[in-house]
């Protein structure tokens, strides 16, 4: 009898890499430019919570994006992202979308070098939010009983409209560009999920504001799992 052992794991890190920075009393390049605190983003150093995962697990699914367009957390003045490469700050300071490109470039390369033989790598596209009338801290809501119509989807997510949830498609643009030429598989869950404004906890989430980001269970995420299993079966068939 043959026994097949497969290992998969879950790791949480907001930006895929090492973070955290505060001004040094002795001064430095960033200090001389007036920076006092922020989030150090080492674009070429993976966070320790997952750095060893590629050499151990058989299947890895990555995603990133929401936090890169989160001014409530990464305020460009009070707590900006400060990008480092080879241990040195990148001057002039990079905007988040340029930093994201660098992080994706380095992290994809890192995983491809470290992934165990036969390992399968996925990058999941963005899980869309559905805030209407403002962001989560601005009275945004998502009180729907039915999936959205195509024109409603475009109103919320179209890059031309620059709506509250525009980061969903923006991040996907950067992700698809970064994955060109790699051997990652893409788990495309964005388009199907954009219609499901009715599938969030909304006012039933137990929070002071509508929860239009997380998903009810069971529901949309079960379809993601079905899609994932289909991908695995196709990979098995091709091999």
Regions found by a protein language model. Name each.
Residues 1-239:
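A compositional signature for long Ser/Thr(±Pro)-rich, low-complexity
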């Amino acid at each position: 009898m043959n026994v097949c052992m497969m290992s998969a794991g879950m790791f949480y890190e907001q930006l895929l890499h090492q973070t955290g920075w505060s001004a040094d009393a002795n001064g430095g390049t960033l200090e001389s430019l007036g920076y006092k605190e922020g989030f150090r983003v080492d674009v070429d150093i993976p966070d320790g919570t997952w750095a060893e995962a590629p050499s151990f697990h058989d299947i890895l699914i990555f995603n990133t994006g929401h936090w890169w367009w989160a001014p409530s957390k990464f305020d460009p003045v009070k707590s900006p992202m400060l990008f480092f490469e080879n241990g040195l700050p990148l001057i002039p300071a990079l905007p988040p979308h340029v930093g994201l490109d660098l992080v994706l470039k380095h992290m994809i390369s890192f995983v491809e070098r470290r992934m165990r033989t036969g390992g399968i790598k996925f990058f999941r596209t963005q899980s869309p939010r559905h805030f209407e009338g403002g962001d989560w801290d601005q009275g945004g809501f998502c009180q729907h009983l039915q999936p959205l119509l195509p024109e409603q989807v475009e109103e919320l997510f179209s890059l031309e409209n620059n709506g509250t949830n525009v980061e969903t498609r923006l991040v996907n643009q950067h992700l698809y560009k970064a994955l060109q030429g790699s051997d990652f598989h893409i788990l495309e869950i964005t388009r199907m999920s954009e219609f499901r404004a009715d599938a969030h906890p909304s006012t039933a989430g137990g929070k002071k504001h509508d929860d239009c980001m997380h998903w009810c269970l069971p529901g949309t995420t079960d379809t993601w799992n079905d899609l994932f299993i289909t991908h695995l079966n196709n990979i098995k068939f091709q091999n």
